[in-house]
């Protein structure tokens, strides 16, 4: 349910962009992100830090897009969020902590060197897509950027998550691999 909530603002943005324009879609994105935050808090009694950061960035850059009637601001939002993620992962690693390990380390046992590689791989992913977003935003038409933002980045993120899962599975201790592949069927 929580993952579905994360995609609702994106779906609303895309639908309203196709029906109206970037400014209506941006206004709806701000409202949908605020509603998402409220619903998340109502259901789970907490809001993740990244959701809050995303809301602030969406609100600031979305408002600037509408106020100045300039779609460049909303185009920058994606890059800024990805830069924040890359910097956050880098800073946490330099402080001796791994955000990825913190999220998954309770369920999965891996050597710290593997967690570090996964962390750096995601830093690379976010950095690459931050730059690619700017390139597409300024070198290609707005329709291409919207499709890239909604579909390209979504598909790339899912694919990278799957690749990360495969990499993790490859480096899991044998006991955990056996436990994760055991399926008990009761007659």
UniProtKB/Swiss-Prot annotation:
Q: Which residues form a coiled coil?
A: none
An example of a Gene Ontology cellular component annotation for this protein is: plasma membrane
Coarsely, its chief localization is membrane
Record bears the keyword Hydrolase = no
In terms of superkingdom, the source organism counts as Bacteria
Record has GTP-binding as a keyword: no
Location in the cell:
Cell inner membrane
Topology in membrane: Multi-pass membrane protein
Cite the entry's keywords alphabetically: Cell inner membrane, Cell membrane, Membrane, Transmembrane, Transmembrane helix
For this protein, the parts annotated as crossing the membrane are 22-42, 50-70, 80-100, 118-138, 148-168
Disulfide pairings: none
Q: What is the recorded function of this protein according to its Swiss-Prot or TrEMBL entry?
A: Plays a role in cell envelope biogenesis, maintenance of cell envelope integrity and membrane homeostasis.
For this chain, the family text in UniProt reads:
Belongs to the YciB family.
Q: Write the protein's name.
A: Inner membrane-spanning protein YciB
Species:
Vibrio parahaemolyticus serotype O3:K6 (strain RIMD 2210633)
